[in-house]
Every structure is written in C-alpha cells, then in structure tokens.
Amino acid sequence: MELLNKKILVVGLARTGVAVARFLAARGARVTVTDMKDEAALAPLMEQLADLDIDYELGRHERHSFLMADLVVVSPGVPMDIKPLLLAKAQRRTVISEIELAARFLTAPLVAITGTNGKTTTTTLTGEIFAACGFKTFVGGNIGNPLIELVTSGEAVDRVVVELSSFQLEGIIDFRPQVAVLLNITEDHLDRYATYQEYIDAKLRIFENQTSADYAVLNMDDPLVAAYAGKMKARVVPTSQRQELAQGIFYRNGSIVYRWEGREELFATASFRLKGVHNIDNIMAALASTLLMGCDAGQALAALEAFAGLPHRMEFVREVNGVAWYEDSKGTNVGSVVKSLESFDSGITLIAGGKDKGGEYTPLAGLVKERVGHLILIGEAKERMCNALGSLTDTHLADTLEDAVALAHRLTSPGGVVLFSPACSSFDMFKNYEERGECFKSLVRSLDDGAGR
C-alpha cells in the first residue's frame, strides 16, 4: 500500500490516532488530524506528535477535509455514522479503521478475537500460550497497544493476537485473520447502535474475508453464535461446555478435550488458576486458537496453570467475617453479569448499576430470583433496574458505591458472597471501569473484620 504524498485524514486523536498519525507521517503521507475536541483538551497528545509535519483541524469536522482525502482512517471511539464519514463514503472516499490499515502491512499469522464478553481475558491468555510455546507474539488491538504500533516498530514476530471491538470491525475492508474467534453475543452498546442487529452484524464482520484455508472458532453454546455457523466460509471449530463434539473443543467431566483432525488432547481443569464457569469458554477458545496454530499441548497446559486472570474480572478481593467479596467491574453488560452469577450457587449480595447502556435487564431475572439474596442498586440506571428486578428479591437503592459496600457488609451473612458486577458502564460516577473497580476494592479492604452486623 503506497502512502507517499497521499492526503490522509485521521479522525479522532486519542492513543490510536497518535499511533496512526505517526506511522503515516513516517511513510511520507500528508497527514491531517481532525477531532471534535479543542487544542487545549488535546495538547498532551499533540505534544507526542510535535516532531512531525502534521496539520490539525480541531473543535470541528470540516466537510472538505473528508472529501479531499485519499484515505480516511477512523479511531475506534468515533462512530462510523457521523455525517462527514457518511458523506465521504457516499463520495467513494476510502474509509477504514486502524486495524484495517495495520493489517495491510502484516505478514505474521493473525488470531482475531471478538465477542461481547471475555475478549480481553481470551486475547491475553492466547498470547500467553503462544509465548510459552516459543512464539514471539504481539498482543494488542482493543487492549494494550494499537496494532499499527507493531507495524511502525518493524519488529518481526511469529504470531499476532488482537482483541477487536465491534467499532473496530465496522471499518474493515480486506482484513482477514487466519483464526477468528466469536465468544458470544449479548446486548451491548445500544447507546451507539440503532438496533441490536446492527451490533450483531458488526461483530460478524470478523469472518467476512476468511476462506476455507482459515478457521472460525465459535461458541456453540451461544444460540446467536451457533445460528451463524452454517454461513462461515472458513472451517468451523466449535466449542461447547454442554455437548461432546466429534470435532472441536469441549468440556467433559472436569477436563477440556481438544479433538481435531485425528489429534486429541486432554486438559484437566483442576490445575487451572483461572476460575469461573464463563472462563471455561475463554480457555477453550484460547486453546483452540493456539493448538490450531502450532502450539504444543504440554506447553499450553503450563501456560494455563500459570495464568491467574486479569484485574476487574471476577477478582477475589478478600474475605470479611466469612463473606467473600468479588470485584467484577468489567461486567458492563447483562450477559457478563449472567456468567458471573452462574459462578455461585446462592447467598449472593449483588451490587449493580451505573450508566445505563440501553439494554434490557430482564435476562437477569431468573438468576436474581434463584441466587441473589440482596440486590443493591446504584447510579443512573438504578431506578430502571429496580423496575425490572426489584420485586424478585430484597432490593435496596444506594446513592454511592461507598454506601452500597457498607450496606452489603451489614446485610450479607457468613458463608455468603458479595459480587460487584454492575451490568452498566461507569461513566456516570467514574472515569472508567478500572477506576470504579479500584474504588470498590479500596472500600472492601477498609472494612473492619470485627464490625457488627
């Protein structure tokens, strides 16, 4: 792909925009960056590009900038349906995501992972297994480093593993992973998509350019994912916790069984540090991806036994007076919370709520009624959540996370579990889910072991 002297517009600065602008400028492109934020807000990011000849259009998006560009590269946080982008597409301007741009310069085999929940854990674990098997591996995309940074560095790697959001997949054209993974699909980001089907269609684009030489790893326990299995051009590698498979990867009697083209490997899960029923799905997807791409089963098992998981995902904080406290701030949608609740049989005090993302809370109803003894709701969404779930168990509304933790401490009996799994984003009360999770853990760590109930 020739970039020298091409007029290229980068839409949205942030970390990815900086990485894209630096790469393009280094290749001799004539780069303009446009962002709706003003110079004062973007000054720290612009400082990172101060040594480069880049034009800026800030606080606005000018129509002519989009129409005059040879190529438009869109950062993940920018909706693809803003008017200037729609206009550019209508005028046959090439509009792509950073992932599409980077992939055009990659030569190493690529594993791409998407889904509503579990992406980051699966992506990280896949990278860990490849590394344990001796492959020099880049892990990035929607987590960590933008993929374009690998291309910029010129570093030679053996394997590339990327987490992809629906937003990144909206901007692909030729992107083709050798292994594409779809973990699950549940309602999410309905504050950005007009319909649920639009969100589903964006996720499915990960398979769009695959051929029969590639692999599509699909969670067949998810009805929505399974419904699209017959439409794949790639070879389908099914995963399941519920059924034994003639070919694929499945869970049976405390072990994960990988069975593919005459090869069979067994992985006893008792030695895994990563716990939770939902993590079996993530582990199976990571194993399938790596074993298909040349990994040794023994080395893969060693990586699994060493991997403890990631912060803010069903993270055990501490036990206080016989009550176990878990922080799951990354549980930002209903599907994620369902999986977290399924990890415990009963005696749960659930703290949930935050910024409403527009989905339905009723899929939680059965588990709340069956397993949740106390429901404590916070944030912007608490009233709507209360309307959907409040009649099913003992329900309380709290003004702050601090109040919710104190209330959970008083209400939960020894032997019970307090689970903070919001089913909402954090932006009504916190900067991001990480800050929210750290706040929760700090509050739990400050609880008095000897406090009365």
Swiss-Prot record:
What InterPro entries does its record include? Mur-like_cat_sf, Mur_ligase_C, Mur_ligase_C_dom_sf, Mur_ligase_cen, MurD
Q: Which UniProt keywords apply?
A: ATP-binding, Cell cycle, Cell division, Cell shape, Cell wall biogenesis/degradation, Cytoplasm, Ligase, Nucleotide-binding, Peptidoglycan synthesis
Query: Under which main EC class is this enzyme filed?
Result: ligase
Pfam families, from UniProt?
A: Mur_ligase_C, Mur_ligase_M, MurD-like_N
Highest taxon listed in the record's lineage: Bacteria
Q: Where's it found, cell-wise?
A: Cytoplasm
Cellular component terms per the entry's GO annotation:
cytoplasm
A GO biological process of this protein is: cell division
Residues the entry annotates as binding ATP = G115, T116, N117, G118, K119, T120, T121
Name where it mostly resides: cytoplasm
Identify the stretch annotated as signal peptide in this record: none
Name its pathway.
Answer: Cell wall biogenesis; peptidoglycan biosynthesis
Question: Which EC number(s) does UniProt give?
Answer: 6.3.2.9
Tell me, what is one Gene Ontology molecular-function annotation carried by this entry? Answer: UDP-N-acetylmuramoylalanine-D-glutamate ligase activity
**Which reactions does this protein catalyse?**
UDP-N-acetyl-alpha-D-muramoyl-L-alanine + D-glutamate + ATP = UDP-N-acetyl-alpha-D-muramoyl-L-alanyl-D-glutamate + ADP + phosphate + H(+)
- Extract the NCBIfam families matched here: murD
Recorded family membership: Belongs to the MurCDEF family.
Q: What does this protein do?
A: Cell wall formation. Catalyzes the addition of glutamate to the nucleotide precursor UDP-N-acetylmuramoyl-L-alanine (UMA).
Give the protein name, as stated in the record.
UDP-N-acetylmuramoylalanine--D-glutamate ligase
